Amino acid sequence: MDCIQCKRTFLNEDIVASISGSIMGDEHTDSYYYCSTCNVYTVVSWWDNFTGVETMEISGPISKEKGDKRIEIIRQCSQPWDKKCRCDAQRRYFNDTLD
């Protein structure tokens, strides 16, 4: 994975946070990569729909300030990898669109 702005290849330690949720039967996962060179985030979003087809989208750059706020929400969830989690942080992150 590369920084969307400077194209630097990310290392494993550049993955700052990930969260998964189930929306209309599809699993949606966002992973945040931080580029210390650019001071921005690149977000990689995966959709695994109920038929088993997976798609990926890369978005950004996201400012450090905005990305930090999103990551703060993710870190309030004790199980961000669990697409079935319905804690306040999960609901807030996914704008109350979870199954």
How would you describe each model-predicted region?
Residues D30-Y32, N39, R91:
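Intrinsically disordered, low-complexity segments enriched in small/polar residues
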Residues D2, S31-Y34, I73, W81-K83:
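Secretory pathway export signals and precursors
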Residues M1-H28, Y32, V44-F50, S59-D68:
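Short recognition patches in nucleic-acid-associated and regulatory proteins
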Residues W47-D99:
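Short, intrinsically disordered terminal segments enriched in charged and Pro/Gly residues
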